[in-house]
């Protein structure tokens, strides 16, 4: 009986002998270490969201440069059309031309600075951005001040008959009904031309407003990136403190 009991005890103890090992504790320690290593790597590594935000801001800047170049061309073209029509007093000051040229230079230099880099290109880009902002503001002020001034050759007496300038002894060649029809048709086309020129001036003012907004986009993107970077840094510090 005692021998059987001994063998029975040995048989009961043998299966339980390998159980009190340190495998579970060792695995738990490795998992904590792995978490710490992953947390450190994620703290040092640039997050995917930050890279995505950087790409988005870069695309916005490129779009603003393209918009500046296109709007600069439109400003020069519209200014040339209005100058041919002798329409605005601001054409004598050259507002559409120097505003458009500065905007085109700002966009082109921004592309060159992004491609080549360098301190000189960066300084030139900053100066042209400031110049584009100032010229857009000045052009808007000049254009809004001269919006209702019609300084062109289509005056109110352009459709009047030239018989008043003749001597009274000279007979009238054109009959009165035909002369009235001619004056009415002349006034109709003149009013259409005035509406067209006013529309062109409104388009030019809109181009300058868009140029003003486009010149402010780099500043807004810079401030937004600073705010985003600060928020991400604070989030990382809070995560490291919790770990």
Curated annotation (Swiss-Prot):
<feature type="transmembrane region" description="Helical">
    <location>
        <begin position="204"/>
        <end position="224"/>
    </location>
</feature>
<protein>
    <recommendedName>
        <fullName>Transmembrane protein 176A</fullName>
    </recommendedName>
</protein>
<feature type="modified residue" description="Phosphoserine">
    <location>
        <position position="42"/>
    </location>
</feature>
<keyword id="KW-0812">Transmembrane</keyword>
<feature type="transmembrane region" description="Helical">
    <location>
        <begin position="65"/>
        <end position="85"/>
    </location>
</feature>
<dbReference type="GO" id="GO:0016020">
    <property type="term" value="C:membrane"/>
</dbReference>
<feature type="transmembrane region" description="Helical">
    <location>
        <begin position="122"/>
        <end position="142"/>
    </location>
</feature>
<dbReference type="Pfam" id="PF04103">
    <property type="entry name" value="CD20"/>
</dbReference>
<comment type="subunit">
    <text>Interacts with MCOLN2.</text>
</comment>
<dbReference type="GO" id="GO:2001199">
    <property type="term" value="P:negative regulation of dendritic cell differentiation"/>
</dbReference>
<dbReference type="InterPro" id="IPR007237">
    <property type="entry name" value="CD20-like"/>
</dbReference>
<comment type="similarity">
    <text>Belongs to the TMEM176 family.</text>
</comment>
<keyword id="KW-1133">Transmembrane helix</keyword>
<feature type="transmembrane region" description="Helical">
    <location>
        <begin position="92"/>
        <end position="112"/>
    </location>
</feature>
<keyword id="KW-0472">Membrane</keyword>
<dbReference type="InterPro" id="IPR009281">
    <property type="entry name" value="TMEM176A/TMEM176B"/>
</dbReference>
<keyword id="KW-0597">Phosphoprotein</keyword>
């Amino acid at each position: 009986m005692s021998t059987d009991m001994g063998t029975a005890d040995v048989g009961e103890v043998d299966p339980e002998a390998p159980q009190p090992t340190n495998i579970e504790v060792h695995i738990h320690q490795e998992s904590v270490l792995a978490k710490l290593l992953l947390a450190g790597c994620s703290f040092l590594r640039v997050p995917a969201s930050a890279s995505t935000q950087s790409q988005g801001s870069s695309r916005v800047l490129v779009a603003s440069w393209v918009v500046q170049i296109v709007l600069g061309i439109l400003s020069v073209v519209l200014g040339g059309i209005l100058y041919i029509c002798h329409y605005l007093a601001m054409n004598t000051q050259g507002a559409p031309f120097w505003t458009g040229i500065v905007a085109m230079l700002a966009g082109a230099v921004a592309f060159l600075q992004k491609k080549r880099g360098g301190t000189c290109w960066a300084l030139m880009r900053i100066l042209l951005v400031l110049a584009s902002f100032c010229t857009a503001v000045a052009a808007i002020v000049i254009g809004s001040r001269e919006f209702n001034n019609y300084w062109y050759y289509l005056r109110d007496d352009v459709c009047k008959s030239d018989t008043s300038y003749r001597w009274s002894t000279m007979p009238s060649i054109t009959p009165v009904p035909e002369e009235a029809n001619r004056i009415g048709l002349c006034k109709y086309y003149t009013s259409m031309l005035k509406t067209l020129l006013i529309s062109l001036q409104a388009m030019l003012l809109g181009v300058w407003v868009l140029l003003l907004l486009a010149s402010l986009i780099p500043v807004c993107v810079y401030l937004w990136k600073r705010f985003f970077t600060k928020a991400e840094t604070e989030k990382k510090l809070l995560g490291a403190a919790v770990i």
